[in-house]
Amino acid sequence: MQLVVVGAHQRTAPISIRERIAFAEAELAQALSSLRQIAVEGFILSTCNRVELYALVEEADGGRSLRQFLAQQRSIDLDELMPHVYTYLDEDAVRHLFRVASGLDSMALGEAQILSQIKTAYNAAQQTELLGTTMHRLIQAALTTGKLVRTETQLAHAQLSVVSVGLSLARQHLDLTNRSVVIIGAGRTGELALKHYLEYTSNITVLSRTFERAARLAEHHKVAAKPISELAAVLQASDVVISCTSSPELMLDFEQAQLLQAQRQRQWVLLDLAVPRDIDRHVGALPEVWLYDVDDMQAICERNRASKAAEVAGAEAIVERELIKWQEWWLTQAVLPTIRALRAHAEAIRLAELERTLARLDLSEQQQQAVSALTSAIINKLLHQPMRAIKDTAASPQLAHAAQQLFRLDFEAI
């Protein structure tokens, strides 16, 4: 078995590529079902900054199959995709996921939202029955690593997020006090944006393609909510727009923005936090319009990364520590078939000899149970040390191979 991850993120692929390969939440079930054709287990992690396929495969070159799968699923030419994707195998794949969960690989160093995004990926894979023992253990280990990094280091303290970076950019152009802010999207990012901007203004309107979600979020924070059908009117009155939907279609195209800005005739800050993008990239060329997408925010995040070198080193040490624990578990899995076969072999002999012996003796049921318990205890004590030795030397499985040959173990009989 080979553990493989194939993916692209904000440092390897521009948003023009990432938005073409991103999976909307509604698309995950079909994609995961198709992934079953090449993977024994797997899951898909798709966020605004990364798209990654994790798979446990039987073939030797699982990376090639996953790259082809991604290209086919997203209808993008493989040659166009290849310069932007990375492939990690086995230990490197596990290390990568642990770093992702820790916020070390995020655009906003230490950001915590990735943990909930990994949980979402886990739930989607679980619903399509694509999670087995290995992937379940891997994801749980990654989440544990992420939590340890956040509790044992200062990495998450005063952390930047895409939302907070966007806020700082907006403040470079406008005094946000009592400004009209529009948030398009009522998911996690939308709620995070709402909490940030409430520190400056209560004149906030939330819109969503599902009005009920916008209404619930707005009611909870005592701001306004509008149906998406009123988007144009709401935008006309706005000073700052934060768009963070998962829509495959643009929420604001160039013609709409041009018409609105001609009517507004004042400064307009547009923060597009969505992948695929919600706002036509040409809108930023309009007079007095400042448009920023997630890639524009990366330089600020990189400066933040450089200032946290000590925290990063501590987090990396935790990742390596947890990776060792994973490797110990993983190596043990490789010898488990031998251990199970050895126990099954011993149990088969015990039962056969017990049956033969009991047939010759006139014992009560209680006596028969006592003899059976005695033979089980003998077998358990005889096997305890050999099985412990096989587990302890899993990294160098000579003992496992020797046991297979000595006892002529039948793995099909397990």
Swiss-Prot record:
Ranges annotated as spanning the membrane: none
SUPFAM superfamilies (UniProt xref): Glutamyl tRNA-reductase catalytic, N-terminal domain, Glutamyl tRNA-reductase dimerization domain, NAD(P)-binding Rossmann-fold domains
Active site, renumbered: 48
Functional pathway: Porphyrin-containing compound metabolism; protoporphyrin-IX biosynthesis; 5-aminolevulinate from L-glutamyl-tRNA(Glu): step 1/2
Function: Catalyzes the NADPH-dependent reduction of glutamyl-tRNA(Glu) to glutamate 1-semialdehyde (GSA).
Source species of the chain: Herpetosiphon aurantiacus (strain ATCC 23779 / DSM 785 / 114-95)
Keywords associated with the record: NADP, Oxidoreductase, Porphyrin biosynthesis
InterPro entries hit by this protein: 4pyrrol_synth_GluRdtase (IPR000343), 4pyrrol_synth_GluRdtase_dimer (IPR015896), 4pyrrol_synth_GluRdtase_N (IPR015895), GluRdtase_CS (IPR018214), GluRdtase_dimer_dom_sf (IPR036453), GluRdtase_N_sf (IPR036343), NAD(P)-bd_dom_sf (IPR036291), Shikm_DH/Glu-tRNA_Rdtase (IPR006151)
Description of how the protein assembles with itself and partners: Homodimer.
Miscellaneous remark of the record: During catalysis, the active site Cys acts as a nucleophile attacking the alpha-carbonyl group of tRNA-bound glutamate with the formation of a thioester intermediate between enzyme and glutamate, and the concomitant release of tRNA(Glu). The thioester intermediate is finally reduced by direct hydride transfer from NADPH, to form the product GSA.
Entry's Gene Ontology molecular function annotations: glutamyl-tRNA reductase activity; NADP binding
GO term, biological process aspect, one: protoporphyrinogen IX biosynthetic process from glutamate
Highest rank taxon of the organism: Bacteria
NCBIfam families in the cross-refs: hemA (TIGR01035)
Family: Belongs to the glutamyl-tRNA reductase family.
Annotated site location: Important for activity: 96
Protein name in the entry: Glutamyl-tRNA reductase
Residues noted as binding substrate in the record, renumbered to the chain: 47-50, 106, 111-113, 117
Binding site for NADP(+): 185-190
Domain notes: Possesses an unusual extended V-shaped dimeric structure with each monomer consisting of three distinct domains arranged along a curved 'spinal' alpha-helix. The N-terminal catalytic domain specifically recognizes the glutamate moiety of the substrate. The second domain is the NADPH-binding domain, and the third C-terminal domain is responsible for dimerization.
CDD domains (alphabetical): NAD_bind_Glutamyl_tRNA_reduct (cd05213)
